[in-house]
């Protein structure tokens, strides 16, 4: 799967506002040019429900990464930044992991990280991060709403996902939301 194919997959968005953390993901699964599932769950709660994680890319690869990430969280006692960095290191150095094609978006009450297929671990500058084919649309919409409205984090995530779903053909309107 090429990196171009990787991002043609979904939209996962994380929004922070007023101490609330909300992650949202659409439910569409696309195989080639067709939609094969409309209500997939692309979000998970990890480490005693203190961390939310979402994925874009290959579903099988994402499940493998969720398992590894959960192991890192256990190993580092829920320290999100340490677990993310260690998973990133493994992803860069392990020959089998380098073959996995997925992106992870992970958040706890204090931090958000994007973990890429190249092993990059990126903490966004703002309270907004998104991955997947509709990520740019969701980020733009959420940024505008965060800066120019009084909507709470959940409302911003819901509205931004609606906008992304109207623009991105790989994103639908069946949104799953998790909050911290």
Swiss-Prot record:
Alphabetical list of InterPro entries matching this protein: ATP-dep_Prtase_HsIV_su, Ntn_hydrolases_N, Proteasome_sua/b, Proteasome_suB-type
Compartment(s) where it occurs, according to its Swiss-Prot or TrEMBL record: Cytoplasm
One GO process term, biological-process aspect: proteolysis involved in protein catabolic process
Record's GO cellular component terms: HslUV protease complex; proteasome core complex
Primary location class: cytoplasm
Entry's Gene Ontology molecular function annotations: metal ion binding; threonine-type endopeptidase activity
Catalytic residue list: 10
Activity regulation comment: Allosterically activated by HslU binding.
Enzyme class: hydrolase
Signal peptide: none
Record's keyword terms, sorted: Allosteric enzyme, Cytoplasm, Hydrolase, Metal-binding, Protease, Sodium, Threonine protease
Chain residues that bind Na(+): 165, 168, 171
Gene3D superfamilies hit by this protein: Glutamine Phosphoribosylpyrophosphate, subunit 1, domain 1 (3.60.20.10)
Reactions catalysed: ATP-dependent cleavage of peptide bonds with broad specificity
The protein's Enzyme Commission number: 3.4.25.2
Function of the molecule: Protease subunit of a proteasome-like degradation complex believed to be a general protein degrading machinery.
The family this protein is said to belong to: Belongs to the peptidase T1B family. HslV subfamily.
PANTHER family given in the database record: ATP-DEPENDENT PROTEASE SUBUNIT HSLV, METALLOPROTEASE TLDD
UniProt protein name: ATP-dependent protease subunit HslV
Taxonomic placement: Bacteria, Pseudomonadati, Acidobacteriota, Terriglobia, Terriglobales
Gene from which this protein is expressed: hslV
């Amino acid at each position: 799967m090429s990196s171009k194919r990787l991002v043609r997959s979904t939209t996962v968005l994380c929004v922070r506002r007023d101490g609330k953390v909300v992650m949202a993901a659409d439910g569409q699964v696309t195989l080639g040019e067709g939609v094969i599932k409309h209500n997939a769950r692309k979000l998970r709660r990890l480490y005693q429900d203190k961390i939310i994680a979402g994925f874009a890319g290959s579903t099988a690869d994402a499940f493998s990464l969720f398992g590894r990430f959960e192991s890192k969280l256990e190993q580092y006692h829920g320290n999100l930044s340490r677990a993310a960095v260690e998973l990133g290191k493994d992803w860069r150095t392990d020959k089998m992991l380098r073959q996995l094609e997925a992106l992870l978006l992970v958040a706890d009450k204090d931090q958000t990280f994007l973990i890429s297929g190249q092993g990059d671990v990126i903490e966004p500058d703002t309270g907004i991060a998104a991955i997947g084919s509709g990520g740019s649309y969701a980020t733009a919409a959420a940024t505008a709403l965060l800066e120019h409205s009084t909507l709470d984090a959940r409302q911003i995530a819901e509205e931004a996902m609606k906008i992304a779903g109207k623009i991105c053909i790989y994103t639908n309107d069946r949104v799953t939301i998790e909050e911290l």
